Amino acid sequence: MKIKKGDLVQVITGKDKGKQGKVIAAFPREDRVLVEGVNRVKKHTKAGPTARGSQAGGIVTTEAPIHVSNVQLVVEKDGNKVVTRVGYRFDDEGNKVRVAKRTGEDI
């Protein structure tokens, strides 16, 4: 998967189109990423005992994972943020590195 934890991404489709956020977690097996402030959902939690005592029930707002095809990487070029696709290349030592397709720079 070309998007990693800690990357700054922009949503390109869906209800949150245009929003930017940092990737909190990546789930490569499901091809999904968790982006802060994007795809917020409300979960109804039941009150019940926990290890530390009682837990109050209620409605909790949290982020839900979105498919990696719905986000694009955002990189900085000349002080501007540019949305780009991600490619790979091998450097001089033979290590595989990510490359921003639009700028041609290593990520």
Swiss-Prot record:
A Pfam family per the record: KOW
Cell membrane in keyword set: no
Transmembrane segments: none
InterPro entries in UniProt: KOW, Rib_uL2_dom2, Ribosomal_uL24, Ribosomal_uL24_CS, Ribosomal_uL24_KOW, Translation_prot_SH3-like_sf
Keyword set, alphabetical order: Ribonucleoprotein, Ribosomal protein, RNA-binding, rRNA-binding
One GO MF term: structural constituent of ribosome
Gene Ontology annotations of biological process type: translation
SMART domains: KOW
Alphabetized SUPFAM superfamilies for the sequence: Translation proteins SH3-like domain
A cellular component annotation (GO) from this entry: cytosolic large ribosomal subunit
Domain of life: Bacteria
CDD domains in the record: KOW_RPL26 (cd06089)
Entry coiled-coil feature ranges: none
Subunit structure: Part of the 50S ribosomal subunit.
Protein purpose: One of two assembly initiator proteins, it binds directly to the 5'-end of the 23S rRNA, where it nucleates assembly of the 50S subunit. One of the proteins that surrounds the polypeptide exit tunnel on the outside of the subunit.
NCBIfam families in the record: rplX_bact
Family per similarity comment: Belongs to the universal ribosomal protein uL24 family.
The protein's name: Large ribosomal subunit protein uL24
Native source species: Streptomyces coelicolor (strain ATCC BAA-471 / A3(2) / M145)
Gene: rplX
